[in-house]
């Protein structure tokens, strides 16, 4: 059983994955709040409480974090609490199998890399990956499995909260799909702007990528969405073909499998 840990700015997803290769399957997953000052001990208590007796079945662990301080604590946690379990953390120097054809590869977020890896491996084609998180990342992977870059926009909830915070007449609202794009009250107006507005933003970016990037104008390009906020706008997206809620966890599994032998040798050497 593989323990997968996906730490983002707002929330963290913890998953347990059985099998490998094409037989890999996310058996359980949990979503918890990310705390930037969390300690390794606190992480261990939380994760051990979530996975319970399955902790005895762990054969590996893989993790990423868009919060550098938490990545350090994840490393300490794995080394102290599961020292016999080989682990891989997505950071510079780790083999991902995805060439990064960008100006500064070290700037590319680990989440973006593993998402593109998972999409390329799963669908076997060039792909556009849309991750709906605290930011919306629209990333591009070529038919050769190369990361070509992408676009980043503020996330749906972040934008709605910012509008409420910067305006005396607006307040924070629950983001659900409104009955119409023409709101009849302030809450519906904000919901319409968020849901329909961001659907249009994503469709616009995907269409622009298809127009501007060589080889992306045909039907052999897969467009896949992931992320906790994706279901909010899926119904109104015309460009997205697939929704894969576990894309990042699958990507972590793929990177672990690529680096597994090296990690086992390191554990044995100790």
UniProtKB/Swiss-Prot annotation:
Annotated positions binding K(+): 131
Binding, ATP: 6-13, 134
Entries under Pfam families matching the protein: Pan_kinase
Cofactor(s) it depends on: NH4(+); K(+)
Known catalytic reactions: (R)-pantothenate + ATP = (R)-4'-phosphopantothenate + ADP + H(+)
One GO-annotated biological process of the protein: coenzyme A biosynthetic process
GO MF annotations, alphabetized: ATP binding; metal ion binding; pantothenate kinase activity
Binding site for substrate: 109-112, 186
Subcellular location per the Swiss-Prot or TrEMBL entry: Cytoplasm
Pathway: Cofactor biosynthesis; coenzyme A biosynthesis; CoA from (R)-pantothenate: step 1/5
The protein's Enzyme Commission number: 2.7.1.33
Enzyme class: transferase
Entry GO CC: cytoplasm
Keywords tagged on the record: ATP-binding, Coenzyme A biosynthesis, Cytoplasm, Kinase, Metal-binding, Nucleotide-binding, Potassium, Transferase
Catalytic residues identified in the record: 111 (proton acceptor)
Cofactor note text: A monovalent cation. Ammonium or potassium.
Complex and partners: Homodimer.
Family recorded in the similarity comment: Belongs to the type III pantothenate kinase family.
Alphabetical list of PANTHER family matching this protein: TYPE III PANTOTHENATE KINASE
Record-given protein name: Type III pantothenate kinase
Organism for this UniProt entry: Mycolicibacterium gilvum (strain PYR-GCK) (Mycobacterium gilvum (strain PYR-GCK))
Classification of source organism: Bacteria, Bacillati, Actinomycetota, Actinomycetes, Mycobacteriales
Gene that this polypeptide is encoded by: coaX
């Amino acid at each position: 059983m593989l323990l997968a840990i996906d730490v983002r700015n707002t929330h963290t997803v913890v998953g347990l994955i059985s099998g490998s290769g094409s037989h890999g399957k996310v058996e359980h997953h949990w979503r918890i709040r990310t705390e930037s000052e969390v300690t390794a001990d606190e992480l261990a208590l939380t994760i051990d409480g979530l996975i319970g007796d399955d902790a005895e079945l762990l054969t590996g662990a893989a993790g990423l974090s868009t919060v550098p301080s938490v990545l350090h604590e994840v490393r300490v946690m794995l080394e102290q609490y599961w020292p016999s379990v080989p682990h891989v953390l997505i950071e510079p120097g780790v083999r991902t199998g995805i060439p990064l054809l960008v100006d500064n590869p070290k700037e590319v977020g680990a989440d973006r890399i593993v998402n593109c890896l998972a999409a390329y491996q799963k669908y076997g084609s060039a792909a556009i990956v849309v991750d709906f998180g605290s930011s919306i990342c629209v990333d591009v992977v070529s038919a050769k499995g190369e990361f070509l870059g992408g676009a980043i926009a503020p996330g749906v909830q972040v934008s709605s909260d910012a509008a409420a915070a910067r305006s005396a007449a607006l307040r924070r609202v629950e983001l659900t799909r409104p009955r119409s794009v023409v709101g009849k009250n302030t809450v519906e107006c904000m919901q319409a702007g968020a849901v329909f507005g961001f659907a249009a933003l994503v469709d616009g970016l995907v269409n622009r990528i298809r127009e501007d990037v060589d080889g992306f104008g045909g039907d052999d390009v897969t467009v896949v969405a992931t992320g906790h906020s994706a279901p909010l706008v899926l119904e109104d997206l015309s460009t997205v073909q697939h929704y894969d809620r576990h894309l990042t966890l699958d990507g972590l599994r793929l990177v672990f499998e690529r680096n597994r032998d090296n990690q086992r040798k390191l554990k044995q050497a100790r």
